[in-house]
Amino acid sequence: MGGFSMAMLKDYVDVFVFAVLGVASFLALWFVIERVIFYSKVDLKAYDDIDALNLDLTKNLTILYVIFSNAPYVGLLGTVLGIMVIFYDMGVSGGMDAKTIMVGLSLALKATALGLAVAIPTLIAYNSLLRKSDVLSEKFRIMKT
């Protein structure tokens, strides 16, 4: 019988959330390193036009923006699904002691914590890279006047 089951959700919610956040953190690190290398090697004299420079300077910053703005929501989704599993288990078992419930809730919150752990460094990197992009663009403008 293929369909939605709470047992399947219980088995795969952490795997799914951690996989998505793991891929997001890998991509964020990859693009941060790529931008740092590009910014360190960019030759402003090779550009004739500020628009072409700005296109190259802001390349891949949108990906970082998407990651830092969505990682907390992915974590929150994992937490909500984890809490759903806890409530389901409570309903099926006819009741649980407070200790078991608290352990389950604390484990469900790890998804939100991981989402924030991905989002916060990505936000810091994004803002730093955006500032560096603005500085390089301004240096180009000064150089051309």
UniProtKB/Swiss-Prot annotation:
Highest taxon of source: Bacteria
Entry's localization field: Cell inner membrane
GO-annotated cellular components: plasma membrane
InterPro entries the UniProt entry points to: ExbB/TolQ_transport, MotA_ExbB_proton_chnl, TonB_ExbB_2
Keywords of the record: Cell inner membrane, Cell membrane, Membrane, Protein transport, Transmembrane, Transmembrane helix, Transport
Record's bilayer topology term: Multi-pass membrane protein
Coiled-coil ranges from the UniProt annotation: none
Pfam families: MotA_ExbB (PF01618)
Disulfide cysteine pairs (residue numbers): none
Gene Ontology BP annotations: protein import; transmembrane transport
UniProt KW 4Fe-4S keyword: no
Ranges that cross the membrane: 13-33, 67-87, 101-121
Oligomeric and partner information: The accessory proteins ExbB and ExbD seem to form a complex with TonB.
Role summary: Involved in the TonB-dependent energy-dependent transport of various receptor-bound substrates. Protects ExbD from proteolytic degradation and functionally stabilizes TonB.
Protein name per UniProt: Biopolymer transport protein ExbB
Source organism of the structure: Helicobacter pylori (strain J99 / ATCC 700824)
